[in-house]
């Protein structure tokens, strides 16, 4: 009996040891959680400009779509969206047109019912001309103007003016900005002439205009003077996991704001395709990479750019570090007047991404961010016929029921109706 008891105890001890070894092996083979906040990645784009044969699909970055038809109230007839923002409960919409119109039209987030206008044109308290962008946070909405170096703040519930927030580094910052807790994150690029241009990729400031942190690149100022400003363009900015990101034209680095700290996340190696900052706008620009937009999910970074008068996309896989690129024929910029030769490199339109979500497409480059993780296509009287044709011919989609819903909404549009917003949610 004693021998049998000893044998059983030994058997259970052996079983226990084997179980612990198995658990240890399982733990050892699990992949650690990746902390995006601390990673820095190098993307060698210059040596990977070899178009791949894979399809460039919208489902790679988008998980869902919904549609909101904006109510055509008498005092809320709008056209093509200029800028928009979608909160949890409302849609804030500014449209292309007269700068003296009401600045923002507010609609219900889900029904599209018109609620009110926000902002007045003029030069009195709380009044402004030419709104540029709109961002909503909590109970307030923040508007910018292309002629005032400050943000105008209004209450969402009644449109009442609250205050102005001075922008410490004003140039170009009104185009893109993010609102935090007593923080404005914006992207000035360069300030007014003061012996030399003050370069700046990203600024974090408080609501009183005090700078908390800024990213200022080291730039060769040779050749710059008050007549020859650096050619940077406007910010290519986006948010990922609620952290504002911006691509620096100066250093080809992507920076992100983490609370009151600015850190680099990516370096894009452009090699011979790097545009010299001192090169004035000319036909030569077609020989250099000009970035248009970025989208980001937990799996990849997707970017669009122009090169040699072609439309390009690249996809960087965060896990495998694989870089894929796509090249598309593109149309030049169209206007009612002859385009000067110096601007013929600008891309007007291209095929863009294949929309396998619902078939709707007005080219990916026209999909405008309307919140930190959503972008939209605005379907208007002007483009509805083109979009209807595209959607009707798109049969291989992830959400056929959404495709049918979209077709029915387009068919229901009358000559005086407001636009339909197709709102796409990024993965993550």
Tell me what each language-model feature is.
Residues 25-67:
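Blade/loop signatures of beta-propeller domains
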Residues 79-83, 127-133, 170-179, 224-227, ...:
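Repeated scaffold domains used in trafficking and secretory/extracellular systems
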Residues 58-76, 116-127, 166-170, 210-232, ...:
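Surface-exposed loop and turn segments in beta-propeller and other repeat-based domains
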Residues 89-97, 139-145, 182-195, 235-255, ...:
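Short beta-strand elements that form the blades of beta-propeller/WD-repeat-like
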Residues 108-111, 155-159, 206-209, 258-261, ...:
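Short loop/turn segments that connect beta-strands within beta-propeller blades
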Residues 14-16:
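C-terminal motif of bacterial Sec signal peptides marking the signal peptidase cleavage site
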Residues 71-81, 103-109, 113-139, 145, ...:
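Blade-loop segments of beta-propeller domains
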Residues 129, 144-200, 212-224:
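Asp-box/WD-like beta-propeller blade repeats and closely related beta-sheet repeat scaffolds
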């Amino acid at each position: 009996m004693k021998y049998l008891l000893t044998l059983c105890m030994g058997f259970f001890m052996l079983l226990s040891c084997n179980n612990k070894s198995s658990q240890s092996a399982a733990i050892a083979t699990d992949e650690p959680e990746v902390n995006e906040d601390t990673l820095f990645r190098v993307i060698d784009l210059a040596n990977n400009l070899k178009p791949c044969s894979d399809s460039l699909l919208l489902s790679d970055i988008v998980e869902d779509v919904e549609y909101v038809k904006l109510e055509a109230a008498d005092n809320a007839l709008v056209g093509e969206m200029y800028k928009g923002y979608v909160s949890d409960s409302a849609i804030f919409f500014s449209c292309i047109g007269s700068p003296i119109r009401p600045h923002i039209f507010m609609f219900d987030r889900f029904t599209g019912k018109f609620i009110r206008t926000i902002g007045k044109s003029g030069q009195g308290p709380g009044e402004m001309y030419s709104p540029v962008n709109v961002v909503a946070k909590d109970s307030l909405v923040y508007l910018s103007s292309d002629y005032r170096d400050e943000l105008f703040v209004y209450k969402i519930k009644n449109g009442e003016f609250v205050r102005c927030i001075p922008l410490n580094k004003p140039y170009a910052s009104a185009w893109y900005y993010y609102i935090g807790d007593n923080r404005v994150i914006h992207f000035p690029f360069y300030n007014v002439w003061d012996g030399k241009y003050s370069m700046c990729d990203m600024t974090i400031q408080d609501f009183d205009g005090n700078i908390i942190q800024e990213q200022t690149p080291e730039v060769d100022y040779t050749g710059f003077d008050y007549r020859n400003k650096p050619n940077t363009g406007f910010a290519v900015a986006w948010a990922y996991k609620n952290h504002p990101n911006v691509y620096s034209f100066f250093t080809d680095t992507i920076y992100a704001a983490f609370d009151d700290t600015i850190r680099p996340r990516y370096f894009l190696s452009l090699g011979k395709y790097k545009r010299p900052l001192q090169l004035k706008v000319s036909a030569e620009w077609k020989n250099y990479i000009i970035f248009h937009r970025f989208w980001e999910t937990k799996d990849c970074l997707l970017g669009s750019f122009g090169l040699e008068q072609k439309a390009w996309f690249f996809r960087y896989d965060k896990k495998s570090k694989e870089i894929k690129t796509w090249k598309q024929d593109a149309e030049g910029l169209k206007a009612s007047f002859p385009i000067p030769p110096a601007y013929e490199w600008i891309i007007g339109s291209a095929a863009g991404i294949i929309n396998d979500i619902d078939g709707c497409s007005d080219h990916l480059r026209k999909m405008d961010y309307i919140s930190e993780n959503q972008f939209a296509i605005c379907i208007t009287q002007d483009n509805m016929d083109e979009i209807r044709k595209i959607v009707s011919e798109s049969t291989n989609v992830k959400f056929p029921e959404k495709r049918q819903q979209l077709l029915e909404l387009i068919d229901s549009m009358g000559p005086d109706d407001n636009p339909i917003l197709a709102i796409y949610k990024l993965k993550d």
